[in-house]
Amino acid sequence: MSETNERNNRHVYQGRVVSDKMDKTITVVVDTYKNHPVYKKRIKYSKKYYAHDENNEAKIGDTVRIMETRPLSHAKRYRLTKIVKKSI
């Protein structure tokens, strides 16, 4: 099986970098919406993920795309795939 086919099933998220203080690690906040079960109102919630940034290229405020990967440490389960938009 080729590498591309295998990676198509992995979770891919897009979020904003909120911390780059660790070496080769960034903290990414991913915002998403859920419908309230009773009132049917859309509720915004966010979740933080630690992602591996091999070259320390992402900075605070950047919009990035991260992909699920094998466990790299105690908390890191994602890696940086693309910087979608650089912060000013």
From Swiss-Prot:
The keyword Iron does not apply. One of the primary rRNA binding proteins, it binds specifically to the 5'-end of 16S ribosomal RNA. This is Small ribosomal subunit protein uS17. Signal peptide: none annotated. Belongs to the universal ribosomal protein uS17 family. It comes from Lactobacillus gasseri (strain ATCC 33323 / DSM 20243 / BCRC 14619 / CIP 102991 / JCM 1131 / KCTC 3163 / NCIMB 11718 / NCTC 13722 / AM63). Part of the 30S ribosomal subunit. One of its GO terms (cellular component) is cytosolic small ribosomal subunit. One of its GO terms (biological process) is translation. One of its GO terms (molecular function) is rRNA binding.
